[in-house]
Every structure is written in C-alpha cells, then in structure tokens.
C-alpha cells in the first residue's frame, strides 16, 4: 500500500518538475575549501535541503547545481571530517556560493578484530550470547542466563537454585567448561547448582548434542562454555561496574571488573573481578516463600603474559554462596507431602526477610588454573593446562540435633569435599596443504571426595585418562570433520558397612567418535550435519544411594552393577542469515543406551517415618528427538520480531513408555523496537515478549504424586539504552519486568512444584558503567 | 628473551608439581553418623491397677535402607481396660544405644506425639503430660479400650521447631508408623 502511494507521489513530483523546466534556469556554483589551509576539498557533498538533488565537488573543489527554479533554498555542504555548513539563498538567476569548511574533531574509534578459539566441533550448532544480549541477563545465575537459547531450559529447586538442561538432559550429562577447565562439583544432585559466577564470562556458549570426542565423558547432552574476555595485554586501565536490583526478593547484585597492562612490562595483562549478591524471600503472586534468601560473594584474579609465540595465563577464582532452602519443602513422610499437595499452598507462611535459616546450603568452589601455549614458527601449536578445583558443600537440615550440646556446635548435617586435579595437553598440528588442520590431545583427571555426616554417597578416588584426535578438512564451501577418542576410568569407593571399611573398585573404558560436515551454499545459507557419540560412567550416587531423599519423598537405591551410558547423537541444522531475516532450524535424534534413571518399584519401603515409594536406579534405552527453531525478522524499519520454539519428545524404548522429568515444549516470542541512533544515547530499545510453556503430557502413568502442572504463559517487557558520558565512559541502563501480569504458575521441572507456586512479578533495574579503553 | 621463557617453563613445572599433592579418600572414611536417627520405637502399655506391662516394638537397627525392619509387633490389648501408655525411642545404631526419648523430653516444646486409632472406636487416647507452653506432648498418657476389634494405631512424632501450637499440622514427621492393633 505504502509503496503504491510512494510511487504515485514520485510520479507527480517528476511531472511537475518536468513542467517547470522551461522557466527554471537558475543555478548555483562555487568552490568548497578548507577554512584553515585554503585548499579545495574534493568529494564534498553539496545538496539542497528538502530536495533530492545534490552533487559532489570535483578535483578542484568545484560544484554546480543546475536547472533550479527561482525561489528560496537551503544549501548544505558536508563531508566527513568537517562540520557541515548551511546557507540560505534566494535564487532569481545564477549564483555563486563558496564554502569554507571548518575541520571537525572526529575520532573514529579503533576497530578491533578479535578471533576466539573455540574447540567445539564445527559441524555442531554452537549458540553464543555476548555483549548487550549477555548484559540483559546480568544478575541472574548461570542456568537462568542460558534460558534464552532454544533447546535450553532449566531444572529448578525453587527460585534460587537452577541448573541448565539441554535437549532434556542435565546434571552429569552436561559438561560445563569454566574458563577452559571442566567444572567439577557435586553435579549429581538436582539441588546442586553450578558454582560459577556468570560475571566472569563475556561469552556464554552452548554446544548442543554429544561432544564426547573433544570433551570426554559426560558430554552426552552438550557442553556449556563459560569464557572470559582475552586479557588486556599492554592496554591502559579499564573496567566496568554492574549494579542490578530486583524487586522480587529485593535482591541486589554488584559486580566490578578492573583490568589493564603494566607500563614498562611489555606483553603483560591482568584482571580482577568481584561480585556480591544479596536477596531475601521470593514472592509468588500470593505469598512469600519462607527462607528463600541468597547471599553470594565471588571474586577472580587473572594475569597473563604474551611474547611472540609464547603465552602464559594464570587464573584463580572463588565462588561462595549461602542459599536458603524453602522451609515449606521440608517433609518428613509421604503423609506430609500429600497433605501439602492437598492444601494447594505451603503451610509455612512468612513475610519478607533477608535472613537465611535452616535448611540451607553453603557452598564454596575454588579454581586455580595455569595455562601455557606456544605457537611454533611452522604453524604447530602446543597447549598445556593444569587446574585444581576444590568444591566444599555443606548442607544444614531444618532440624538441629536434639542433643543441645551437639546442636550448639551448629555443624552441617552433610559435608562433601571434592578435590579435582585436571591436566590437559593439546597439540595442534600445522595445517597440511592449507586444507587439513587437526589436534591431538591427552587429558587426565584425578579426583577424591570426602564426605561427612548423614550417610548418602561414599568417599571415592577417581582417575580418568582420555586420548583424542580430531581432523578438519576445509575446501570451497565444504567443511568436513572427524575425530575419535579413548577414555579409561577407575573408581574406588570407600564405605562403612556394619562398622567395617569396605572398598570397591570399578573400571570403565570407552571409545567415542564424531563425524560431521558443514556446507556453505552461499554467504547466507548453510547446512550442518553431525554424528557424535559420547558416554558417561555411572556416578557414585547412582551406584550407592541408599535412603530417603527427603526433598522428593522417595526412597532411592543405587545399583553397583550399573554400566556406562552410551549416546549416539545425530544433529542437523539449516541456517539462513540476511540483514533483515535470519532463521535456524535444527533437528536432533539422540539414542542413549543403558540410560540410567530411577525406576518406581511395585512395593513401597518401610522406614520409621512410614512407607516411602521405592525407586531403584535402573538402565533402559531411551530416545530423545526434537526440533529447535529460531527466527528473527525485521519486518518494518527498526522493528524486529523474534520467535524461538523448542519441541522435544523422549521415549523409553525398552519399556515402551515415556520418561519422567522431561521439559515441556515451549515457544518464546519477542517484538523489539529499536530507536534510531542519537548523538547522546544509542542502542535504545523497547521490547515486549511472551513465553508459552505447554503442559507436559508425556509422562509415565502413576509415576508421580502429582500430575504435571498445566500450561502457562508469561509476559515480559524490557527497555534500555546506552549513554556516552564522555569519550571513554559509557553508562548503560536497562529496565525489565518478568511475569508482567503476576501470573501464578508452576513449572514441571521445578522440584518445588509440589509445595508452592513459582516466582511472581519481578522488576529489575540494571546499570552498567564502563570506563577506560 | 630466552631467559624469560626458561623462567616461565620452570614456574609452570613448579606449579604442576605443587598440584600433585594427592590425597587418598580411603584414608579418611568417617563412620556414618546420622544425627538423631531413630531405629526403634517401643510402646509400653501398663494395665491400670496392676504392674502388668506389655511392650510392642518397631525395630530397624541399621536405619533407613540396608536390611528391612527386624521387628514390627502387633499390639494386642484387652477390651474395656484402661492402660498407661509410655513411648520409648532409641537409636541402637550407636554403642551404647542413645536414648532419643530423653532428648525429645528435653525439647518437648518442639515435639508432639499423635496416636490415631482406626477405627476410632477401638481406643481413646488422653495426653498425660504438657510442655512449658502448656501444650500436650504425649510421652505418657492414658489409653482406654472398649469393645473387641481389629484395626491400626498410627503413631506419629511431629517435629515442630518454633511452630508447635497444639495441633498436629505444623512441622514434619520424625516417626510415622501404622501398628496393627488387636483388641481381644
């Protein structure tokens, strides 16, 4: 419609212009010069404001505009590097107008091109958030920050603890690489969130699908890469301060980074970073959740040195958190659970408080890492990384010991200390004939776990060794990739059985492989296909659990004869990207044989707290198939609509049934209006979005106390902009409202869905002050 | 230049060595110690006016899991009699066994025993003790039987720290057992 009107107007304009040519013989001509030097300026634009006519100055700085009708005109002369100049004219005949332009102080910002080394398989979909998209997630925990990716959801224990789920797989089936080191915490528990401060990262990436060859055991569902920015070698001091406030939980987060080089010490760079977080009780639309506060203190230090081909980096980080566990989720027996479910809302009511009482967990995670690499002149590259992690988890039960003198000590009821030493050596061979590049690597891991308190999982020593080889062939539009790996793992467990120390040895070994192809049909259109295998040895909780899981009101029993899980993953994707429209369609089919899960047993088990449903760790064969679709279309000027769809179907093929705890399908739509750039502020936007999560209808019958919660739809709005405070200082402001209409809902993958609703409306204000180069 | 490289390699090697201070998890196995485990619950019925005491127990010496409960007695009482009912809780996984009853008595303002017969006509329970806040406890009380019949007696210990209000609702179960009750 608009277009027709436009063409019509254009025609009229052309006709009237034509009609007037006979009388319009006026002209303007002149010379454009630099005010200071007096030199002619070549290539400056001289145009008539409000009309579509303009000319460039020639090699002598001359210009001439002809065939003008008599009348008043505004002439503008401009060129980059000079202030534009306007002049009003009353034309009756020919006129000469010379311009003397004043040089403008324009400093174009340096353009920096950085390349990132990502070891992820190139034929697998890799999604990344960084920059302002990542900024929008600031203040949230790692899993929440990743929820924007299609195919990524989260497994929650209330609102403060969440862990990422990729294509329906989580915990030990997802590998998290924190700054190049595999994160080793007590990942087996669903209430054990990854101990990583997202403020460390300037890039968060997700490799969807099995990536067992490059990363070894556990990367069945995918890999999450948490990567900091390259250290600022030989740069002046810079930094940023982030402050985020949330109304729900009255949570405040403050994080700062300072970095730079050292004068007189060439090739050196350093960075210091710290985060503080404090939040109180979370509120659902109707009530507060008692004891859901959080307090977090993290910091990291990094330094590095670069000289020619040599690079050395050292990194230290400490993550320290204290999380309250919703006291209404504490149950002693099945009767307690059923009465909470029947009540429909928690029995324990509270107001707002920052206080964190029992039950709670205090977790600290310490990482120290040293990495060195050397680029040889001939193109070979060698990299060696060593790291030590200490994960210290303390869980405090609701009930203190009845014995007063013991209670006064306030000891945690459960303590795990997990120490991990990793060692990775990677050799990138020099490209052969400019087309074949590859790497050969060896990684080892030594780990020991010490536990104290309520019997849950045993102490253990674990040793892993993996050897891998990958090659990539690139030729006109094609990229082919192949790799293989061998892993060997020993595990020795130590338990007390009838007051005797019992140790048990396990040995696991496995081959994995990957084969992939990428075809770039054009600059805009590409396709990828990857077949990958991965494996995962059963972890100690699956081997040795034996007791009531109070949070789940279930008696869980491990099985020491479990065999490793093996996954075969096929993933294909098509991608189209043009300036106005981008779309990515991915499909995957993941077969996991000997998939370990908790199988409900026919007979309940009797304890002093009553009869509990009895679940045993069992193996089956499962298939995970799904579709991820994301598309974004700038359908009108400045206005973009984005849609993301995740669809997943999981089936237990051995028992001909569905599997429990699989995220439901969802669609996320956003419409965003970006304001045109202004001299003072830029990147200003306003967006409104909706997330629709379907009900999970594919669950095995009689497998749960409660049917999966119904579907829900949440609205959110966001707005933000960036101001240039000065040449080297920027202030970014963002406001967002999640769950705009304060809807009561429960998510199937929130373990507290039995007890309470999910979080209500949450307004957040985000400020980011960036300074320095 | 050569020098810095040498130094850096040495540093890195030194770091690698310091990383290898391994420890063995097997040297440090602690005896599992579950706080306040209850492995045995004994109900002692003493017929009024006599010294005849009969005890009925639930025993699971190794706690949850492991071996199944070794004992879960059927309560046998006479019709139309009045009994004094006392309860005893023990943790027999420790040597010597620790007496949880004493600890419950010490923190009586956080605990409540609930005795629920089904059908309710089998037995009537009356509390015989009160805590500092004048709420009943149930460590001792009276049980009155009526006509003969068979059913269950549900015995619960509600743990209600800070929330005890005289009703069973707040808190969570520390004990929840369904004894078979025969009045004959």
Model-derived segments and their meaning:
Chain B
Residues 39-45, 104-119:
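Extended low-complexity, serine/threonine- and proline-enriched intrinsically disordered segments
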Residues 81-85:
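Short beta-strand segments enriched for Tyr within beta-sheet-rich domains
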Residues 31-34, 72-79, 170:
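Short, solvent-exposed beta-strand/turn "edge" segments of beta-rich domains on protein surfaces
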Residues 17-43:
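Bacterial Sec-dependent N-terminal signal peptides
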Residues 1-21:
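Sec-dependent bacterial lipoprotein signal peptides
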Residues 50-52, 91-99, 160-166:
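Short acidic/polar inter-strand loop motif in beta-rich domains
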Residues 115-184:
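Helix-rich interaction surfaces within compact, conserved domain-sized segments
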Residues 50-78:
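N-terminal edge beta-strand
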